[in-house]
Amino acid sequence: MVYFKKIAAVGKYHDDQAIPDVIAYITRKDKTPSRIILGYHVDMLDIANCMIEVSKHFGKYSRIRLHHFILTFRPVDASLIPLIAHEICAYIGRTYQVVAAQHEDTPNPHLHIVFNAVSYVNGYRYRGGKEDYYELIDRMNSIIYAHGLHPLIPVKYRANINNPHE
């Protein structure tokens, strides 16, 4: 069982510090002791600036700067996280710069995935509407299912928010 949560709030991720702050958070050493961090179409030593440069190149360094979601796994499924992260990032990375980091600072390991709101391919913004959302969920479900796990459960459907695996 894998739980999905999109991090979104009114006004969140709109300011100039959004990309550097989120990248710094998801790649923190205390959160990622195994250092399972991967990225597509970014310099792993300068992730935030790579994303900012693409947005500025296309004249779109305004409004929402990035998209961020979390996949939470059962501890027994932790060994699958790097494989799943790679496949999800390969899918998103066809069009957007993307970074994933496995956090191990809670009983249930979880994967943070962050991608630039502006495409490095054509400069278009990720719209993030219902159609985009469900297309992404469907692709992630097919990846997760291929690894023998049950499809994603969006966080709003969780019975117990404090322990998603009850």
Regions found by a protein language model. Give the residues of each.
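N-terminal nicking endonuclease/strand-transfer module with a His-rich metal-binding environment
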Residues: 1-166
